[in-house]
């Protein structure tokens, strides 16, 4: 992101990273997890609700993107880099069996950047987390993006290192109240 080191460095080429992102978007679309802020496609957001299952067949576009854009050696290197960071917030919450809303993708096309669409997109996820009474979580690989998420109300939950320069920042936004389930139990 703007010259910052990040997970893009784990990919052998920018085209492999682009293929991965396209595969992820196709998977999100097939699972009904892709949302937009408006008619013009000002911002796109992919999030997974607690308990939402990923259909097996929908993983094929992502797998095809990975295997089609990298050699076996490059795939092994990519897997090695990705495993260095250790368990993130998502894995910790899974282990503790705590529900959460996971934001896997947030994209604001260049013509719409700096116009508040990132906030609008995130507010969709925050509102859904609020409605369900669960935290919204995401991870990002650039310090400047992390700072934007912090400005939008998220909290830094942890940092993972991938090699000498690359990091992943785990962020969380807790709901203001316990949601529908919390209200029923009172």
Which role fits each region the language model picked out?
Residues 44-107:
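Conserved acyl-donor/pantetheine-binding loop and adjacent beta-alpha core of acyl/acetyltransferases
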Residues 104-113, 137-147, 163-164, 174:
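Conserved beta-strand-loop-alpha-helix junction that forms the acyl-donor binding cleft
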Residues 1-15:
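Helix-loop element at the rim of GNAT/NAT acetyltransferase active sites that forms part
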Residues 119, 131-133, 142-159, 163:
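Conserved active-site alpha-helix within GNAT-family acetyltransferase domains
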Residues 11-33:
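Active-site rim helix/loop that mediates acceptor-substrate recognition in acyltransferases
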Residues 100-101, 128-141:
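Conserved GNAT acetyl-CoA-binding A-motif
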Residues 30-48:
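Conserved beta-hairpin
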């Amino acid at each position: 992101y703007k010259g910052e080191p990040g997970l893009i460095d784990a990919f052998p080429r920018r085209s492999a990273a682009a293929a991965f992102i396209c595969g992820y978007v196709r998977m999100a679309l097939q699972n009904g997890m892709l949302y937009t802020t408006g008619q013009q496609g000002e911002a796109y957001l992919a999030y997974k609700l607690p308990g939402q299952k990923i259909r097996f067949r929908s993983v094929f576009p992502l797998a095809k993107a990975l295997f089609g854009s990298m050699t076996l050696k490059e795939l092994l290197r990519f897997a090695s880099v990705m495993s260095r960071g250790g368990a993130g917030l998502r894995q910790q919450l899974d282990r503790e069996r705590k529900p959460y809303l996971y934001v896997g993708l947030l994209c604001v096309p260049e013509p719409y950047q700096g116009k508040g669409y990132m906030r609008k997109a995130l507010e969709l996820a925050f509102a859904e987390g609020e409605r369900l009474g669960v935290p919204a979580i995401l991870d990002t690989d650039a310090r400047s993006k992390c700072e934007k998420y912090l400005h939008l109300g998220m909290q830094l939950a942890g940092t993972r290192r991938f090699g000498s320069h690359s990091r992943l920042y785990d962020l969380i936004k807790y709901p203001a109240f316990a949601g529908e389930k919390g209200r029923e139990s009172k």
